[in-house]
Amino acid sequence: MNGFTPDEMSRGGDAAAAVAAVVAAAAAAASAGNGTGAGTGAEVPGAGAVSAAGPPGAAGPGPGQLCCLREDGERCGRAAGNASFSKRIQKSISQKKVKIELDKSARHLYICDYHKNLIQSVRNRRKRKGSDDDGGDSPVQDIDTPEVDLYQLQVNTLRRYKRHFKLPTRPGLNKAQLVEIVGCHFRSIPVNEKDTLTYFIYSVKNDKNKSDLKVDSGVH
């Protein structure tokens, strides 16, 4: 349920199918991990357990993982939750006096509930300020679009996405680097929202991802 084939993305339009397939796979990975601490992504509340880093390929914070952020130069000691950090979030708060950044030694991208709430409040203040400045309508760039947590996907799924779209990368990338590259491309795909939603609903109703995965696993 965490994979998709190039054929799947070509039916109903490459872009719409690709977006629908990635969203479906990320949602499925999150649902499958509900009993073990996996979550749905950047803006979803959740709770994790306490302490250091786990394997970079884990879907959701592992037992004993700490928040991946540094604040004022010090690594956060709070338990990692289900929300994840990204360069997009870093950019959205870079204009504020919030001295938080990703700890380069962290082997995951999950953050604690404290920092998740802090980031949300900073972004909300930014949106309100934009609304006040222009008389009620926030600038387009300040609209907080839903975030798909690509870190929930398996490494093989990310590699298949990279191969399908022929994304230029160097060999030996780890999961965090793949997520960043795939995420930048994924957010840049122009799609028709109606087509994407229609394809997504169709895939879910027909359990399409699961059947495609069985066929694809037989090929590989």
Curated annotation (Swiss-Prot):
The modification Phosphoserine is found at residues 131, 138. Residues 130-220 are annotated as: Interaction with SIN3A. The lineage of its organism: Eukaryota, Metazoa, Chordata, Craniata, Vertebrata. It is found in: Nucleus. This is Histone deacetylase complex subunit SAP30. Residues 1-129 are annotated as: Interaction with NCOR1. Component of the histone deacetylase complex that includes at least SIN3A, HDAC1 and HDAC2. Found in a complex composed of at least SINHCAF, SIN3A, HDAC1, SAP30, RBBP4, OGT and TET1. Interacts with HDAC1. Interacts with SIN3A, SIN3B, HDAC2, RBBP4 and NCOR1. Interacts with SAMSN1. Interacts with HCFC1. Interacts with SAP30BP. One of its GO terms (molecular function) is zinc ion binding. It comes from Homo sapiens (Human). Keywords: DNA-binding, Isopeptide bond, Metal-binding, Nucleus, Phosphoprotein, Repressor, Transcription, Transcription regulation, Ubl conjugation, Zinc, Zinc-finger.
